[in-house]
Amino acid sequence: MLMPKRVQYRKTQRGRMKGNAQRGTAVTFGSFGLKAMEPAWITSRQIEAARIAMNRYMKRDGKIWIRIFPDKPVSKKPAETRMGSGKGSPEFWVAVVKPGRVMFEADGVPREVAVEAFRLAAKKLPIKTKFIVRPDYEG
């Protein structure tokens, strides 16, 4: 599971997901990418499930890059707890993903294999996604 080794603050405010992604919108490492079309919190478990689905389909061929990292702690109070008495303890970690963000990249496999691998990965994510190809890709 992905999570930071250490953080400056144990708990963060929830924040808002306004607008589109400003950075990380282009395929830079691989030839193919999976782009987010909606804003969402993607948990470390969802990222891991998508990674495993892609790796299983691609077997040993190719390389995968994960372009998002869950660096935001989400706190939760225990069940059946009265209101008040402070903020709950951090339960899990999320990556804040805005529309246009490239979440995963792949290289070293044919286009058809990449399309299917990303389709399987997209099923593990709670948002609409889009398969994109690097502009200078020849294949």
From Swiss-Prot:
Entry-linked Pfam families: Ribosomal_L16
Listed PROSITE patterns: RIBOSOMAL_L16_1 (PS00586), RIBOSOMAL_L16_2 (PS00701)
Region (Disordered): 1-21
Keywords: Ribonucleoprotein, Ribosomal protein, RNA-binding, rRNA-binding, tRNA-binding
Gene Ontology BP annotations: translation
SUPFAM superfamilies associated with the record: Ribosomal protein L16p/L10e (SSF54686)
Biased composition range(s): Basic residues: 7-17
Gene Ontology molecular function terms on file: rRNA binding; structural constituent of ribosome; tRNA binding
Source domain of life: Bacteria
Family (UniProt): Belongs to the universal ribosomal protein uL16 family.
Self-association state and partner proteins as the record states: Part of the 50S ribosomal subunit.
HAMAP family: Ribosomal_uL16 (MF_01342)
NCBIfam families associated with the record: rplP_bact
Function: Binds 23S rRNA and is also seen to make contacts with the A and possibly P site tRNAs.
Designated name of the protein: Large ribosomal subunit protein uL16
Species, as recorded: Chlorobaculum tepidum (strain ATCC 49652 / DSM 12025 / NBRC 103806 / TLS)
